[in-house]
Regions:
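Extracytoplasmic
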Residues: 38-43, 62, 79, 95, ...
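Histidine-centered metal-chelating micro-motifs
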Residues: 53-55, 73, 90-103
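Short acidic-glycine-tyrosine-enriched beta hairpin
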Residues: 33, 37, 48-49, 78-95
Length: 129
């Protein structure tokens, strides 16, 4: 017997009501770092809709985050949760697992810039547990 909650989730999926909570990621720049063999720089913007969040993941890269709009909550495994507002920054190292990445607001969007220094050709995001 299906619970009422499961029926509601399935109904939302069928109508697309749950779509829209995923972040919008836009590549701004990708550049081979010729002075650092095998590395490339990648700049992205990430827009979280109200209530938006990321799954647990890692970048296998040095990641520098700078908040442009709204408020975001970030945390790497073993670190403290940080709520960031415009003008604040956050760092993720190549061995870090990003366990919290979400919009702090359920009513307003948030936007930030990510600059990654990573192995050339390596995936930008790797799912993690």
């Amino acid at each position: 017997m299906m619970s009422t909650r499961l029926i509601l989730v399935l109904a939302c999926l069928a109508t697309g009501s749950l779509v829209g909570h995923e972040p919008k990621v836009t590549q701004v720049l990708s550049k081979d770092l010729t002075d650092i063999p095998g590395k490339e720089g990648l700049m992205l913007t990430v827009e979280y809709p109200p209530g938006g969040s990321d799954p647990v993941h890692r970048h296998n890269a040095h990641g520098f985050i700078y908040v442009l709009e709204g408020s975001v909550v970030m945390q790497v495994r073993g670190g403290k949760e940080a709520t960031l507002t415009p003008g604040q920054s956050f760092y993720e190292g190549p061995d870090d697992v990003h366990v919290v990445g979400r919009n702090a607001s359920q009513t307003k969007p948030a936007k930030f810039v990510v600059f990654l220094v990573k192995d050339k050709g390596a995936p930008v995001v790797v799912p993690a547990k």
